[in-house]
Swiss-Prot record:
Protein name per Swiss-Prot or TrEMBL: Ribonuclease PH
Keywords: Nucleotidyltransferase, RNA-binding, rRNA processing, Transferase, tRNA processing, tRNA-binding
UniProt record, GO biological process: rRNA catabolic process; rRNA processing; tRNA processing
Binding site for phosphate: R86, G124, T125, R126
Record organism: Shewanella amazonensis (strain ATCC BAA-1098 / SB2B)
EC primary class: transferase
EC number: 2.7.7.56
Length: 237
């Protein structure tokens, strides 16, 4: 039996709170069960040097975990003087996923910086971050349109993400830490609101998985993401 008596296809309770902070153009507290991530989207004029004169905008992301977001305290990466490989991998994933949802030409020569800070971690922090950041991004883009900084809406579609995996021989959706840490397979899936795949990250950490198991996990992800996007839409409305 899964924690909380969840079925294999069931996500944790998901909550999205908009306008969580006062200063960012878009800010969201996203909660996947006990995983809580603060996501902000900041609109800034100008683009990186490689895009100057192109008429195209840019979106980039940063990710971090508070020292006591985990069971035992960890040092801040700033105190260590460098980011871990895991942090760099996750923030690149968040940036790639969100860029897929935006028409950068419609953004003009402006940049959106997304910051995802994990307040409390219980598995699935990167998928929660992508999900919350998408809503913060929508609010930042609406702010920019309201200010006349962009004309047409650069957002192409909503995106969301969820973890899936195989635990005790069974494919399950939205793994919390006790499941994730013991899973034979761990996978993260990012999809659009129409069910198209943006990214799949999957690793057999214990036993290799079959083609059939892969399809089962993707189907679980599609079902879970559909529900998560419904939650995004409800928050935005």
């Amino acid at each position: 039996m899964r924690p909380g008596n969840r079925t294999p296809a069931q996500t944790r309770p998901i909550s999205i709170t908009r306008n969580f902070t006062a200063h960012a153009e878009g800010s969201v507290l996203v909660e996947f069960g006990e995983t809580k991530v603060l996501c902000t989207a900041s609109f800034t004029e100008g683009v990186p040097r490689f895009l100057k004169g192109s008429g195209q905008g840019w979106l980039t992301a940063e990710y971090g975990m508070l020292p006591r977001s985990t069971h035992s305290r960890m040092d801040r990466e700033a105190a260590r003087g460098k980011q871990s490989g895991r942090t760099q991998e996750i923030q690149r994933l968040i940036g790639r996923a969100l860029r897929a949802a935006v028409d950068l030409k419609q953004l003009g020569e402006n940049t959106i910086v997304v910051d995802c800070d994990v307040i409390q971690a219980d598995g699935g922090t990167r998928t929660a971050a992508i999900t919350g950041a998408c809503v913060a991004l929508v609010d930042a883009l609406n702010w920019a349109r309201g200010k006349g900084l962009v004309k047409a809406n650069p957002l192409k579609f909503l995106i969301a993400a969820v973890s899936v995996g195989i635990h005790n021989g069974e494919a399950i959706c939205d793994l919390e830490y006790v499941e994730d840490s013991a899973a034979e397979t761990d996978m993260n899936v990012v999809m659009t609101e129409t069910g198209k795949i943006i990214e799949v990250q999957g690793t057999a950490e214990g036993e290799p998985f079959t083609h059939e198991e892969l399809l089962t996990m993707l189907e679980l992800a599609k079902h879970g993401i559909r529900e998560i996007i419904d939650t995004q839409k409800a928050a935005l409305n």
